[in-house]
UniProtKB/Swiss-Prot annotation:
One of its GO terms (cellular component) is cytoplasm. The keyword Transport does not apply. It comes from Danio rerio (Zebrafish). The keyword Electron transport does not apply. This is Haloacid dehalogenase-like hydrolase domain-containing protein 2. Its cofactor is Mg(2+). Substrate binds at D13, L14, S15, T46, N47, K179. Belongs to the HAD-like hydrolase superfamily. The gene is hdhd2. Mg(2+) binds at D13, S15, D204. GO terms for molecular function: metal ion binding; phosphatase activity. Pfam families: Hydrolase_6, Hydrolase_like.
């Protein structure tokens, strides 16, 4: 691993780290405001596929978070980029609220399958259509493969089990574009003019947020909010650089120990 350099960027997960549905993590807005005063770039990286970037931005602004829409990098964006690179016509297995981020793509007579979190579309008919397309040679593009995510009433199935089911049934492997893929983190850093060794990631998912970031060369800070479950930090190797109670505590650590100022 390359030597650590001066911290230049902080990547922050959204759902489970800054907010859970329409409720902010206590103290998160104030902590973000303090981080904004430090000499680091801030970017928000998310696997959220339930809604388009614009809706997500409006939700966060409604919770009084200080951010700009262009600071949000989503796995939907990464998926669209790959679809355009491959010049394919996707069957979009995403919620209707996320379709805005795919506006302009040709989707008639699909020859590829793009799957995200789509509870309203995870039925036999749609899954079987995807199954048949893949058997006919269509590539399977997974926006991400999270096992589950946090809702107010508990944990809920993520897209991962459905992606894995299609992989199993068709004896193929999906191309995954979201966290924890190394390429996702590198793409998120690209316009920040910094290397992974100059960045830290904060998130509630040990595998996808912290493990993925550290595999890309970043530091990873795991927070015990959102989908975190006891002993999650022991599920990745190397373990998180730091595990702390919540986002405000992670910001305190960054200001005190990685930047040396509060």
């Amino acid at each position: 691993m390359m030597a650590r350099r001066t911290l230049k960027a902080v990547l922050i997960d959204l759902s489970g780290t800054l907010h859970i549905e329409d409720t902010a993590v206590p103290g998160a807005q104030e902590a973000l405001a303090r981080l904004r005063q430090a000499p680091v770039a801030v970017k928000f990286v998310t696997n959220t596929t339930k809604e388009c970037k614009r809706t997500l931005f409006e939700r966060l602004r409604g919770l009084n978070f200080d951010l700009q829409q262009q600071e949000i990098f989503t796995s939907l964006t990464a998926a669209r980029n790959l679809v355009e690179q491959k010049a394919v016509r996707p069957l979009l297995m995403v919620e209707d609220s996320a379709l805005e981020d795919f506006t302009g793509l040709e989707t008639s007579d699909p020859n590829a399958v793009v799957i995200g979190l789509a509870p309203d579309h995870f039925n036999y008919q749609t899954l079987n259509k995807a199954f048949q397309l893949i058997l006919d040679g269509a590539p399977l593009i997974a926006i991400h493969k999270a096992r589950y995510y946090k809702k107010k009433d508990g944990l809920a199935l993520g897209p991962g089990p459905f992606v894995t089911g299609l992989e199993y049934a068709t004896d193929t492997k999906a191309t995954v574009v979201g966290k924890p893929e190394k390429g996702f983190f590198l793409e998120a850093l690209r316009d920040l003019n910094c290397s992974p060794e100059e960045a830290v990631m904060i998130g509630d998912d040990a595998r996808d947020d912290v493990g993925g970031a550290q595999n890309a060369g970043m530091l990873g800070i795991l927070v015990k909010t959102g989908k975190y479950r006891p002993a999650d930090e022991g599920k990745i190797n190397p373990p998180p650089h730091l595990t702390c109670a919540s986002f405000p505590e992670a910001v305190n650590y960054i200001l005190d120990h990685l930047l040396g100022s509060k």
